[in-house]
Amino acid sequence: SARSLAPQNDLAYKKITFSKLSDNAYAYTAEGDPNTGIVIGDDAVMVIDTQATPVMAQDVIRRIREVTDKPIKYVVLSHYHAVRVLGASAYGADHVIASEATREMIVERGQQDYLSEVQRFPRLFRSVETIPGLTWPTITFKDRMTLFLGRTEVQIIHAGRGHTRGDTIVWLPKERVLFSGDLVEYGATPYCGDAHLQDWPQTLQKLRDLKPLALVPGRGDALTTERAVEDGLAGTQAFITELYEEVKKRAQANQSLKQAYDGAMQALQPRYGNWVIFEHCMPFDVSRAYDEAKGIDHPRIWTAERDIEMWKALEN
């Protein structure tokens, strides 16, 4: 039978860490589960990525309330994935901010992604019944926008295509703190099911050029030294580059998706096999890399049905 879509042994409780990165920036991290960023301005709070459900978002709010009673006015979406955005309603924010490309992806595939992600990661959608529906941005921007939370300058930048075509980073230029979303992972496997693998390294270079002193990845610990930041950037870049090269050479040799998957697993397992969700991500990652190598620029939409078909093809 097809392997269960939910990662094996994925029901374990994850320890939450709420770490201070600067006087006004915090990271909510959970041992490789999706992270949330927090910026506290003079009179308002910004939340970057929401957690998957309103009930899960309540824990973020509880941590925020331990350090400030200022209202949460802004939610920023790093990209469109359900696990990042569907907790938004809990915050009661005035505005939900996303790139134009992210809003287009919500229109095009948000509902399908919601249904397939809930099936893939039941544990990450605790109290799924509290989700009121898709999260819709109230403000979009094409390339970048700047928000001032009093004296705190917040740059919201569509850095380029990578993890998705809508990827957005949040940069505090004075503090030199960067919230990368899933463009960077640390000790966790990049999910590439909606990725643009050939563009991703150039997008990472734009992040590197900012010279962050601290970086909050999409998954994994907050990186709080320049050395750790570079490790996060370099590790992510190495994974996506090796993945694409391994799959491309097999696709160009007209090998099947199954052959490309087996070959890529064998090549990447020694170095990356201990990263969180490696076994879970690789089928999606290889599927997208294979399509991209075959010239499919626009990632095909994942549905719950396509998930199951793909697993069956790769398990046989």
Task: Indicate where each model-derived feature is located.
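Conserved beta-strand hairpin/beta-sheet module of binuclear metal-dependent hydrolase folds
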Residues: 18-63, 168-182
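Divalent metal-coordination and catalytic microenvironments
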Residues: 24, 39, 49, 64, ...
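Active-site neighborhood of phospho(di)ester-bond hydrolases with catalytic His/Asp-centered motifs
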Residues: 48-50, 73-81, 97-101, 159, ...
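Active-site environment of divalent metal-dependent phosphoester hydrolases
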Residues: 55, 80-86, 103-106, 164-167, ...
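Active-site HxH/HxHxD metal-binding segment of metal-dependent hydrolases
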Residues: 62-146, 165
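Core dinuclear metal-dependent hydrolase active-site scaffold
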Residues: 140-172
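Divalent-metal (often Zn2+) His-rich catalytic cores of metallo-beta-lactamase-fold enzymes
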Residues: 171, 199-259, 263
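C-terminal regulatory/interaction regions
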Residues: 253-316
